[in-house]
Amino acid sequence: MSSALAFSQRVVKGSQAYDEKGVVYIQGEKTPYTGVLQNINEKGILESEAEYKDGKMNGFSKLYYPNGKLGSEATFKDNVQDGLQKDYFEDGKVKLEIPYKNGKVEGTAKEFYPNGKVFVEATYKNAIKDGYEKSYYETGVLQSEKIVKNGKMDGFSKLYYPNGKLGSEATFKADVQVGVQKDYYESGKLKAEVSYKNGKVDGVAKAYDETGKVIEQVTFKNGVQVK
């Protein structure tokens, strides 16, 4: 015959707890709390709950909608967020995914449409955007993409039509637009060319019809039209 020991975590209402210099205690107790703290509103509905060990958040942390559905879940280690945070729509589908490491966003964060398709995804390093950032139409077709370095646009930036065709392409350096921006018709034909220098229009700007004929031409110097 075999036997098993069942372990049940202690569960206490948040109203019975207090925080002293980042360490949680239960009123009337001298030992830092280990167990689950639950915040319940005046209607008796669970709003949030979190795991604690030795007075610090260690384990899951969850937030709930008024209907009882899970709204958000995250993981903590010694009061510091660590791991993948997931936020949910009220119907239970994932709304956000945000990776944390030592309390800072680290990795690829994603936001979703209610239909489950990715809306936006961006890469973070040490809580700062660094890498590719992309957005999508609700159909799943790429809407935009750009390169970000240390929180600033640095490299190409492209916009797309709902049919997937390129609509515009530009270049940035430390958040400042440089080089030639090209805009396109949905057919793929060139629509306009505009030169940028240090974030200002500089040079000859041209607009085209879909046959490729120049229909407008203007010259700029340091952002000011000169011809």
Residue spans of the language-model regions?
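Glycine/tyrosine- and acidic-biased, solvent-exposed loop/turn segments at the edges of beta-strands
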Residues: A4-K227
